[in-house]
Design a protein with these regions (language model features):
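N-terminal secretory-pathway/extracellular module detecting exported/lumenal segments
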Residues: 1-47, 51-105
Length: 105
């Protein structure tokens, strides 16, 4: 895994599936939850557009799973709003995307 949050969630990404287009990096990530969410999900995958030049990201697709590591029944799928987000300083998301940018520039 790449990093772990304070509450024990682990974040991964598939290095061999990273794609670059212009200044953007596109990647599939996975979050493995320490304990199931209130909805019963144990993990989720996400497809993200990452702009390392000004450090922002846009989630393009999310898929939620009943079991750990993206296994089991899909409980929900979604396409988030088409807007950029900026990771909170010191957050696990900031650490995760910093690592992705470092490894793929």
């Amino acid at each position: 895994y790449v990093t772990k949050s304070v509450d024990g969630h682990k974040f991964y990404y598939e290095k061999d599936r990273v794609r670059k287009s212009g200044k953007y990096i596109y990647l599939w990530g996975l979050t493995d939850l320490l304990k199931p969410s209130p909805y019963g999900d144990s993990s989720y995958t996400f497809y993200t557009q990452l702009d390392c030049s000004i450090f922002r990201f846009k989630d393009l697709k999310s898929i939620y799973y009943k079991k750990s590591m993206g296994e089991g029944e899909i409980t929900a799928e979604g396409t988030p709003k088409d807007e950029w987000s900026y990771p909170k300083p010191g957050s696990v998301i900031e650490k995760f995307y910093n690592k992705v940018c470092e490894e793929n520039q």
